[in-house]
Regions:
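Conserved ATP-binding subdomain of kinase catalytic cores across diverse folds
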Residues: 50-156
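N-terminal secretory signal peptides that target proteins for export/translocation
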Residues: 1-5
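Bacterial N-terminal signal peptides
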Residues: 9-20
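Short, intrinsically disordered, charge-balanced linker/junction segments flanking boundaries
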Residues: 22-25, 222-227
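A short, sequence-level motif marking secondary-structure junctions
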Residues: 80-86, 216-217, 224-225
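Regulatory N- and C-terminal appendages and interdomain linkers associated
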Residues: 22-65
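A broad structural signal for short, well-ordered beta-strand segments within beta-sheet-rich domains
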Residues: 46-52, 145, 178, 206
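Conserved kinase catalytic-core segment
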Residues: 101, 106-111, 156, 161-224
Length: 227
């Protein structure tokens, strides 16, 4: 029980120094106000300007790294992931991604979100097919593709494990972020440890941690990669 109490203490403690570091990290990783990004991703007219497979060496990867225009705003770099027909296949359930994004709002302030701004959009099939040959309409009644649209984080890196025990013990702000990530992934029953699902900020102290893929969560079957 003692380790759990210690972790919860780190999660809830908020000294002034920690808040300053958190604000700095917010600017480094998510460079626009959360509310503005939510409006752009969810509601403004969407036009794909350029896109490519985000991990071309990963077999079967369907996630696009895309430059997208949203209305009159400057183009944004986003993650664009198509749903398969029916929008309910293993490791590709768009409603889980939007649910994970929304759930964190119950206990985290925007400056400490561990899931970057995320929305669901319907994209015309012809537009999506330019960058994803063979893509099919998600629902038979609409000539469109349901897609997860997620803000592409800045100043981050992929590591084998975002949790570092030594850093956790020495850096209270980093420890706080790890605790917040741990709480969310527990609540949503995140069960896919695939490399790249969790990202670490590049800040030397107070680095943020993020969860960007939630296809194997909630009521999903377990991943063969483990948890």
């Amino acid at each position: 029980m003692q380790p759990l109490r210690r972790l919860m203490g780190l999660v809830t403690a908020a000294p002034l120094l920690a808040l300053v570091a958190i604000a700095a990290a917010q600017d480094a990783n998510i460079r626009q106000p959360i509310a503005d990004l939510e409006q752009l991703l969810a509601a403004e007219p969407l036009v794909i300007a350029q896109a490519e497979i985000s991990r071309p060496k990963a077999k079967g990867d369907i996630t696009l790294r895309a430059i997208v225009s949203f209305g009159e705003a400057a183009p944004l770099l986003v993650k664009l992931r198509k749903a398969e027909p029916g929008a309910d296949t293993f490791n590709n359930v768009p409603r889980y991604d939007i649910a994970a994004y929304g759930l964190q709002k119950l206990f985290l302030d925007p400056a400490e979100y561990v899931v970057p701004p995320t929305a669901l959009r319907m994209v015309p099939l012809a537009d999506f097919a330019k960058y994803s040959p063979g893509v099919a309409r998600t629902f038979s009644a609409a000539d469109q593709v349901l897609a997860v649209v997620q803000y592409w984080l800045n100043d981050i890196k992929v590591v084998a494990d975002v949790y570092n025990p030594e850093r956790f013990a020495a850096d209270p702000v980093y420890a706080r972020h790890i605790g917040q990530l741990n709480v969310l992934t527990y609540l949503i029953r995140h069960r896919d440890s695939n490399l790249g699902n969790f990202l670490l900020g590049n800040a030397e102290t107070g680095a943020r941690v993020f969860s960007i893929d939630h296809g194997v969560a909630f009521a999903s079957l377990d991943s063969d990669r483990g948890t």
